[in-house]
Amino acid sequence: PFQYLCISDDTDLSDDSLWSGQKYNIERLADKLCDKARAQLIVDALHKYLADEYTCRALCFCVNKRHADFMAEQLRLYGFNAQSLTSDTPADERKQLAKDLREGTLHYLCVVDIFNEGVDIPEVDTVLFLRPTESLTIFLQQLGRGLRLSAGKTELTVLDFVAQANRKYDFASRFRALTLQPEKNIQKQIKEGFTLLPLGCSIVMEKKARQYILDNISSAIYNKNRIVNEINSYATIPTLTQFLENNGQDIRILYQGSNCWSSLK
């Protein structure tokens, strides 16, 4: 099971200048995230929410090498055992870092994409989302790194640092994918505290983080890719009525340009 905590992040990621095409511009996003005040906020959350922040085995997902190196350095400055691992890390060093995390001699490994898939460290008991992840597939792969079964491991703790996001960013699909009934209205689920989760799981949102997410869903800019991604986040393809009700959107969003419902499914 997982305990998913959404932490309020005061970083403003809503400006269109941070966005390129279908995702955030990596370098501009890193400029915003490599911030000492934000690092302090992250450390404060570790102290507040983790049972033992000095002995956990955490994967920390970062936006690029600069961000991963920055976060590892900041965590070390606060007394945590932390390292960074990216595609530039030599193979032998990668293996050693993975071994250290597995054995508990390393507690925080700040990574970029490389741990999305193909690397199995069942002992990981904590995941930190230190960046917004646009791809639902990558988000689920990252979450899955911590959901492996391991002796003595009772649950996964997830800290997701939620900032004010660009209107093109999709929070809805992410949280819908975590519920047992993704066809249900996701805004209602958020407001009611997620009553449709797997046994033993929870999603808890700090007040400001919850409002950021609800505001984002309400003001979302829909294009064809966004709509297709949302449809694909359902367990079964929804009807037109279900889709509109669950997203709180006007039918006109589906008929912009040459779009139509049958072509989007």
Which residues make up each language-model segment?
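Short glycine-/polar-rich loops that comprise or flank the Walker A/P-loop
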Residues: 1-2, 78-81, 122-126, 134, ...
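Conserved interdomain linker/interface between the two RecA-like ATPase lobes of SF2 helicase motors
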Residues: 1-59
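Amphipathic alpha-helical transducer elements in NTP-driven molecular machines
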Residues: 39-40, 95, 108, 112, ...
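Long, largely alpha-helical accessory region at the distal end of helicase-like NTP-driven motors
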Residues: 41-42, 47-48, 52, 171, ...
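Conserved helicase ATPase core of P-loop NTP-dependent helicases/translocases
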Residues: 59, 67-116
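SF2 helicase motor core recognition
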Residues: 109-127, 143-148
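Conserved segment of the helicase C-terminal RecA-like domain
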Residues: 132-179
